[in-house]
Amino acid sequence: MTMLPSKARVLHRLLQFRSTCFGSPSCGKAASSRLVLGIETSCDETGAAVLDETGEILGESLHSQKVVHLRTGGVIPMVAQQLHRENIERVVQEALERSNVDPSQLSAVATTVKPGLALSLGIGLKFSQKFVRQHNKPFIPIHHMEAHALTVRMLQPVAFPFLVLLVSGGHSLLAVARGVDDFLLLGRTLDEAPGDTLDKVARRLSLIKHPQCSTLSGGQAIELLAKDGDRTRFRFTTPMGQTYDCCFSFAGLRNQVTMAIMKKEAEEGIEQGTLLSCVNDIAAATQHTVATHLAKRTHRAILFCKANGLLPSSSPTLVLSGGVASNQYIRKALSIITEATGLQLLCPPAKFCTDNGVMIAWNGVERLREGKGILPPSVDVCYEPKAPLGVDMTAEVKAAAIRLQSIRMKIPN
Ligand code: KG4
Ligand code: ZN
């Protein structure tokens, strides 16, 4: 459709008005809606964002350390801390400037304080406590996984309770979200998280040397290469087939993959650190096994929820989030399970699945609305590197020992 020039000009002026109006003190929206600044530094992203109460993002800024950590072969906490220290002030300043919001207009500051890398959490928390004291603003400490779980509600109305699968570089958990700060933990990883496994497999395969993968995270590199791979050329056993609970384990799979890589290196007569000819097939088989493992544990969690009336009978929902949730193949695997069990599957877009300041600000909005966990600026808060989410129900899930009817995991590439 073509637009008349005059109509286009009017639209342009309206859009200009909308963007200048955002966040300005005299603007109805900013004046009537409470504003929250969110700050994230739990791992390797320095993020900040200002949101209004409706979930409108007024301004955001994100500094990713990904490329630095790719070069050093993983996150070195002291390096992460230094990069947060160098960037936090600028990132927060940018988010405020882009929103056209002055600190005096904020209703609260929300910051990730758990779980995460101690050195990284410390930078965000110290900055935030100084900031709230300086501007005399309430402080809302945020649980990073609670924020991942609630992000979807910023984008569309999703009523509690819903089931959530959170998969990232640091976490793997299944929980029922019953309220903003009310979770039932059904499953968690017993060793490492799927993103960590994919990052380590990518490193072992030296994918950083692959022309298409030099700036991609391990998970992204595996997803890209798997598209041209034949997953049937390597057969890895899906973990925990004989354990009838909803917990996860990925270390054994990583071991299987490493052994396969070593065998291939010997066959091809090449040294570790050289790209194998079969990287696409190994990527495809690894991704498939991760996807199948996540799908099976989630299937059992859905059956447990159904047996115990933990989800509503009308539009029961599974929310998939966290960095690994941006993987399209994994999304398809989960959609096979939700289709078979009558749930709707919701995944935030990739940019909201990985760590960012927006999700923290949104969690602040949710808590502000309900008046939960809002502290005066003077209260001293400590960060917690380890912090479980919700009430631990993993023993009850295990005791239920639910057997799965087999669902064919024919996942299209
Ligand atoms: O949520 P996130 O940004 O940070 C943590 O809290 O860990 O997740 C980062 C993780 C990394 O391990 C990365 O390899 C993985 O998410 N990841 C992916 C994809 N994109 C990022 N894993 C699989 N497929 C992807 N497309
Ligand atoms: Zn995360």
Task: Please identify what each model-predicted range represents.
Residues 314-334:
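Glycine-rich phosphate-binding loops at beta-strand->alpha-helix junctions
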Residues 27-34, 141-163, 363:
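Conserved phosphate-binding catalytic cores of ATP/NTP-utilizing and phosphoryl-transfer enzymes
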Residues 1-33:
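N-terminal mitochondrial targeting presequence
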Residues 114-120, 126-128, 133-157, 176-177:
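Active-site neighborhood for divalent-cation/phosphate handling
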Residues 29-34, 42, 49, 59-60, ...:
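A short helix-loop
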Residues 242, 247, 251, 260, ...:
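Adenine-nucleotide phosphate-binding core of ATP-dependent small-molecule kinases
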Residues 33-107, 111-115, 144, 148:
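N-terminal beta-alpha supersecondary unit
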Residues 141-142, 317-318, 335-360, 377:
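Conserved phosphate-binding/catalytic loops in two-lobed NTP-binding clefts
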